[in-house]
Amino acid sequence: MTKGTDIELDEIELGFAGFFLNRTSRSGILRGGVIGGKAQAGDYKLDARFRQEDLVARIRAISNRKSQITVTGMDALELLMTVGPGLPEKCLAYLDPPYYIKGSQLYRNHYQHGDHETIAHFAANTKLPLLITYDNCPEIRQLYRGMETTEFSLIYSTHTARPKASEILIHANVKIPNKPTLTRGGTISSSAAERIVF
């Protein structure tokens, strides 16, 4: 049993609560607030990203590969340095660190500048095929100067009319199409994914 502030939850209940909060918070971030706002007066309501049939299908797909999945609480770089040397040749590491500019407002465990520097140093020196996504800001461009980058924009899936967020994709030891095509929800289209070369 896991103790909350005033209730006890077993692991399944706690896992579902975390899953529900992720799917009903803006961009999956608790501090981002509830989709539609507390008054639910927005165009999109609390359940905009909680499409049950789709989520059940995703969970089943993950469950089908559970023997290939390991969950760890290790720091991302510690994990990569530990398992990286033993990874298969055709393996891709993907890092999605906390945003540089708004990280402290969005995440409880946001990075300090030194943490971002450590990631950049790792990226510049690793032999692993590596993708990193960040907010596109001067500080990140400076940290990753000299590395291959691709700038792109995402349209948030809960509101197509919302302004685009400027992002940057940093890549090391991998060749990427000039302009990856991102589909709704932020995934690379299959045609672009097929052209990524290790």
Give the ranges of each region predicted by the language model.
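Class I S-adenosyl-L-methionine
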Residues: 74-92, 99-198
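SAM-dependent nucleic-acid methyltransferase catalytic core
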Residues: 1-94, 98-104, 137, 165
